[in-house]
Every structure is written in structure tokens, then in C-alpha cells.
Amino acid sequence: MKSLHWFLHLLIIAFTVLRSVEAQNQAGFISLDCGLVPKETTYTEKSTNITYKSDVDYIDSGLVGKINDAYKTQFQQQVWAVRSFPVGQRNCYNVNLTANNKYLIRGTFVYGNYDGLNQFPSFDLHIGPNKWSSVKILGVTNTSMHEIIHVVPQDSLEVCLVKTGPTTPFISSLEVRPLNNESYLTQSGSLMLFARVYFPSSSSSFIRYDEDIHDRVWNSFTDDETVWISTDLPIDTSNSYDMPQSVMKTAAVPKNASEPWLLWWTLDENTAQSYVYMHFAEVQNLTANETREFNITYNGGLRWFSYLRPPNLSISTIFNPRAVSSSNGIFNFTFAMTGNSTLPPLLNALEIYTVVDILQLETNKDEVSAMMNIKETYGLSKKISWQGDPCAPQLYRWEGLNCSYPDSEGSRIISLNLNGSELTGSITSDISKLTLLTVLDLSNNDLSGDIPTFFAEMKSLKLINLSGNPNLNLTAIPDSLQQRVNSKSLTLILGENLTLTPKKESKKVPMVAIAASVAGVFALLVILAIFFVIKRKNVKAHKSPGPPPLVTPGIVKSETRSSNPSIITRERKITYPEVLKMTNNFERVLGKGGFGTVYHGNLDGAEVAVKMLSHSSAQGYKEFKAEVELLLRVHHRHLVGLVGYCDDGDNLALIYEYMANGDLRENMSGKRGGNVLTWENRMQIAVEAAQGLEYLHNGCRPPMVHRDVKTTNILLNERCGAKLADFGLSRSFPIDGECHVSTVVAGTPGYLDPEYYRTNWLSEKSDVYSFGVVLLEIVTNQPVIDKTRERPHINDWVGFMLTKGDIKSIVDPKLMGDYDTNGAWKIVELALACVNPSSNRRPTMAHVVMELNDCVALENARRQGSEEMYSMGSVDYSLSSTSDFAPGAR
């Protein structure tokens, strides 16, 4: 056994070495020494082995300089030079990256009296069109480091320095590092670093590349009230954060083990929203009678994570799935031993970020690309304002451009004025990519060649001014362009006194126009007469008894779409263009299924989930009708609510309330990267899902059978409240008489009632069977069907394991024993009753809800007894702003 233990550690060492070797090539790194000259110069910084190069290929403006020689020995080489921007309000670096990927972007600023003025600058940093941070230099040798984790929406990124006062913006270095997309998850916005610390066992400065393959800068933290523990053995750091070995091999624990440990900090902005990432690994070899288990709460007892046991020599990363805030900017985190613990809490590393809201959308990417090409083609880099995003923000729009700013999509260019811009050569085809352009002024330049035909294809274009270009061929106007002029949809100015006009038509045209006008007046009178007749009839109709119901009860039987008025409810019907707007052209995918794809949306300021029917779905429209019919007439706090629906031509969509925490299966498996669901969470989710299902059976008239109950159809909101979803297969059954309905079998393998499958007779007990399978998943966190098991189906596997009389052998090991044993037995027995092969011997959902409430009560009693064991004293230390941690010394 001992040899196996060491063999596993050797594997971890080998993996770590491979990752280290792989990291040496700095793949994806962009490391710019700003102001470095000449252009060809590159070098490797000795203390980090990072290769830096000049920034000249990434920016068109600025002056180069160097910090005072007296200060150079205090800093790494990449901050010896600076690039400053005395001209222009906004100056931007343009970096080519991979769209929709996550990057760490870091700007470093060391003044070093480079200009001899001894004036400490202050200015703003922008990421694309959005403000990132404010830079305030506090001293000649103070290092100001600003870092953000950002998902780039396009294949290029602008990092801009914006002048906000009398002083001149400058930058020393700009670094971009790729990250795993699965790391640092947020609901929205980007992450600006506040602090990133680790707890070394000996005095140390900071850690970065090549110990950290992503070149994150880890600052050491020491405190009089804390002691440090460490290990020489390797740590398994194989999660999406790729934590450095040197960071995870050490940890801090409070000196006074009997008292809770208080960790606090104050954000620079009181109302800032924050994400906190804590990294844990057990670095001590615990004996059989030693246990390290603790709870984490924050800001007065709000639960962060319960019953945490750091895994032995293996990483566990805990973070909040949504942003948290504090009214005064102060955050207090308390780490307290549980009653089962013999050892104090530990913490290996901590990262704190504030949210940068990305509210300003970037200009349409095709138009940005076109403008960059136009800028390069005509050598327009000398235009001071032509930096960063062409349109956004509006305050810094490029000179000569006018833009439109739609609410839900990126800005668009609607006019381009390059009058007198010293343009030479032919008219570039990149102009044709500005598809919403209405006005184009290329006058008073030295353009040559023919007038391009693509002008005629630009449907939005209303005015073109080509005057003052003596070498432009104005004699050959393309026929298609002449037709646009003839139709008066376009004005073409060719010279100072020459505007291309429509070719003259026959003299009969005025008579035709007069006749058309008379006919138009007559038609208008006829329409008005018809309108008043219809209006009078409508008034009479409204005096009759109340209107017919908007929704026909029961199941819609017809499969012909044109004959289904029963699902048309004007108050909730949404058009396809509205769907496009609310989803931002289907930008963010939440999930995919047999029905189609589910997208994130925003309707009237509220988040929604938009499920689009796939055109390839054979039974999709039938299920669509069934789900609309059901959801328009049922309302329950534990059923996902229907906000609206779209039935617009071939486009079908269901718009639901948004469930921020995804489905139960994702949360059980850990795919969402959040905390392990506690036993208390699981019991509450089971009760709430059962209540929703019980309502369908007993609260609806006629009663409903869901037919597809499974963990992926139980959705969780931001508070982990459960709601039953996906009613596309639901069926009603009679109130009186027979309690079964004969129907074609439908459902999901593994959850499907075998009696229903065998007989085609559907009843509410079919849902009870499926829910029993869900309960077994909740308890065991095992797949429903696993062919590698001796008994593949979860029902059979649990029954077999229970013959040994040990409930612990089937309960999810991620719970680490943190559950009420009596409650676990009770819920497993209930689940096995639900999956009885005979439907007559299964309980009703009303009985299931009652039994589950008993399980919740048992768990609550256990929790209250455990929490009384917490000590009330505290040990605390604080974290200050990231500026105090900035690494500058070599």
C-alpha cells in the first residue's frame, strides 16, 4: 500500500514536470515592453525568463522614454522604458486574440520621473469601449499594477489609456496571458484584481511565471496571529485553475485553534460587487483520529461553504457562483471548526476580484475590421482620434464618423467623412462592408481609378460625394449605380457643379402622376368608409357576453399549425424580431436538447431563458403546443414559469423565467464548478421538486402527468430553489373514471416506468417512478445507468448495496459523511417504494411530499445541534489593496 502511495505521488510529479516543460514556450503570451526601441529588440528578463518585445507593432501613437537611471536597479527590465501620450485624449493598443476566449490582461506603470517633471500622473484605463480602472501614481518609484480577467468578444482587443486631467498618461509594460475558459466563472462582467495572496512557510516576495504557467502574480502574506504549515510532497492541482505547486504546498492556520479565524478586507469602492476564489489542499498527513472540517460564513453569518474538508494533497477551489457585495465595502469571512473537527481551518491561497461591468457593446466586428483596413490602406494613422473602437464610447468616436447606437447590439457606422484626408489610389472595397452607411464623403482627395459598382449594392447609401478627385474616372458610371440615381434612392456628387441626376423620362409622366394622385385619394376614402363600418360592428360585438377563453383546456389534437388558435394569447405572444433582440442574436447558449437550443435573454430588464424549436425536430411542434397549453394554465412556485412564446412563421420559441444555477444534474456532477450540494440543499430541492409534481397531479384540472421527470429537468434559481421544467411530453388524464390513459410511450431511458413501457398505460404513478429514480440520484450522485457496474441500473445497484446493511456505501462520498443517517435511510426507503415494479404499490406524490418534509426536519434538527458547538471568539487579519502587493523589485 505504501508503494502505491508513492507511485501515485510520482505520477503527480511527472504530470507537474510535463506541465512545466510545456509552459516554457510561453504559448499565447504577449509581453510588451512599452517604449522599447529599436523595433527588432527582444530580450529575456532574467528573473522570470519571460521574453519581452517592443510595442511598436501594437500602437500608432505615443512618445518613448526611459525612467531615471538611478531607479533602474530597483525594477525588472520591462519597466525601464515607458511610452507616454501627450497628444490625444484616447490612445489605444490593438492586440489580436481569439474571440470568446478568456485572458488575463495586465498593465504595469512605473513613473521613475521619466519626463523630469516630478509630477505624478493620473488617468483612466479602458478595456475596449468600457472603463477598466483609474491609474493614480503615488510616488516616483511606486509600482502601479492593474490586472483584469476578460473574455474578448472579437478577434482583437483594444487597451486604451484615456487622459482625464492635466497630466500625461503613460505605460511601462502590457502583458496578455491566456486562461482556461472554465476558470474564474462569473454571471456577467469582467474581473479586476483586488488581491491575490498565498501563505509561504518562510519569508518570500512573490511568485509568477514560470512557477505559475499563466503568469499570475502571487504575493506572500504573513501575520502575527497565524502560523504556517507545509509539505514537500506534490499537490494534485489538476483543475481548471492550474495552481502553482509552490503556492499550494503551504497553508495558513490560526494560532488559536479553538477560536474562529476572521479574515477581512475593505474594497476601494463601497458598493463594488466582488468574486472570491479560495484554494484549499490538506498539506498535513492526518492520523486516523484527526479531522480537519470547518464552515465558512461571511458578513454576519451568511453561509459561504459548509463542512469543508480539504482533500489530502489535492486542490479544491471554492468560489461564489454570483457576485456578492457589502454596503460599506467591508468583507468579513469567518472560518470555524465544526463539532467533528480536531484541527483548525486552513487556507492555501486567496484571490479577490471586483466586477467590471461591460455595459458598452463594441462596434460591429465586420465594420471595425473594415475601418482598420481603411485606416491602413490610406495611411490614416496620423488621425489622432482614430484609436480604439471606431464608435464606442460615443465620447471618443472617431473623427469623421457618425454612428447609430442600438440598445441590444453593437454600434453601427452610418456616415463616413474623409474629405481632404489626402487619400490616394483606388476606392477600397472595404467601404462596402459598412452595410448601414448612408452618407459617404470622399471629396477633395487624390483618388484614382473607376467608380466601383459596389456602391449600387449598398442599399442604405443615400449620398456619395466624389468631387475634388481630379484623377478619378467620372465618365464611366456603372449602370447599376445609374439606376439607383434614376430611382432617386441615391445622390451622387461628382464635381463642384456636377451632380448626377436622373435621366429624363417621357413627358407623359406628369399625367401619370396626376392620375395616380387622384386614384390614391379615392382609395383612401374607400378605406376610411370600410374602417367606420368595421368599427361599428366591433362596438356591437363588445356588448355581447364575455369573450371566449384564450386557451382551450386539454390537449390540442390537431397537428396543422394554421388550425390551432387555442394557443394564441396576444398578451404573451412575442415576435421573432423581439426574440432576436432579447437574446442579442442568440449570443449566449445555456444548453441544448432534443427540442432545440436554449439561449440566455433579457426581456424588460429581467433575465429569461429562450428555448428555440429546432427545425429538424420531428415531434417538436406537437411538444411545443403541449407545453404552451400547459404553462398558460398552471401556476406554481415550483414549476418554471412561462414568460411568453413565439409562433412566428417557422420560428417557434418558449420564453421562461431564467434559472441562474442550471439543472440539478449539472450541480450534482460539479460541471458548474460551484460548491458540492449539501445534504440540506438536496433535501430541500427534493421537497420543492416533489411539490411541483404533486401540484400537476392534484392541483390541476384536469390533472397532468409530466412524463419526463429527471434531474436535468429540475432547475435551480440563484438561491438553489428548485422548479420542475420541460413540459413538452406532458399529458392530461381524466378526473373521473379510469385513472390510466393509453398513449404512445415517451420519456427518458432509465427514468421510464417499466409498467408504462410494457402496457402503454400512463398514470400519475409513472411520474412517481421517475421521481424515485431522481431521489436515488440525489442520495448517491451516481449515473442512472452505468454499464460498468455489476447491476447497471441505479435501482438495482442501490438495492444490492443495501443488502450489506451499510447506508454509507451508497451515499455520495462528496458529502464526506455530513448527513443525518436516519434521514438517509428514510429517503432511500422512500425512493425504493417509488420505483416498485407495480404501480399499485407505489406511493402518491402527496405521500412523497409528506415523507420528504420529515427528512428535511431531521436534517434541520441535526444542523441546529451542530451549529451550537461553534466558538464565539475570533482571530483576525486583514488584506489591503492590491497596490500594496505590486511586484517591482527583482
Swiss-Prot record:
The keyword Transferase applies. It is found in: Membrane. The modification Phosphothreonine is found at T575, T743, T748. Residues 24-513 are extracellular. The active site is at D708. Residues 1-23 form the signal peptide. The modification Phosphotyrosine is found at Y656, Y756. One of its GO terms (cellular component) is membrane. It is a single-pass type I membrane protein. Keywords: ATP-binding, Glycoprotein, Kinase, Leucine-rich repeat, Membrane, Nucleotide-binding, Phosphoprotein, Receptor, Repeat, Serine/threonine-protein kinase, Signal, Transferase, Transmembrane, Transmembrane helix. InterPro entries: Kinase-like_dom_sf (IPR011009), Leu-rich_rpt (IPR001611), LRR_dom_sf (IPR032675), Malectin-like_Carb-bd_dom (IPR024788), Prot_kinase_dom (IPR000719), Protein_kinase_ATP_BS (IPR017441), Ser-Thr/Tyr_kinase_cat_dom (IPR001245), Ser/Thr_kinase_AS (IPR008271). Residues 535-890 are cytoplasmic. SUPFAM superfamilies: L domain-like, Protein kinase-like (PK-like). ATP binds at L590, G591, K592, G593, G594, F595, G596, T597, V598, K611. Residues 584-856 form the Protein kinase domain. Glycans are attached at residues 49, 96, 142, 181, 256, 285, 289, 295, 312, 332, 340, 402, 419, 465, 473, 497. Its EC number is 2.7.11.1. LRR repeats lie at residues 412-435, 436-458, 460-481. It catalyses: L-seryl-[protein] + ATP = O-phospho-L-seryl-[protein] + ADP + H(+); L-threonyl-[protein] + ATP = O-phospho-L-threonyl-[protein] + ADP + H(+). GO terms for molecular function: ATP binding; protein serine kinase activity; protein serine/threonine kinase activity. Belongs to the protein kinase superfamily. Ser/Thr protein kinase family. This is Probable LRR receptor-like serine/threonine-protein kinase At1g51860. It comes from Arabidopsis thaliana.
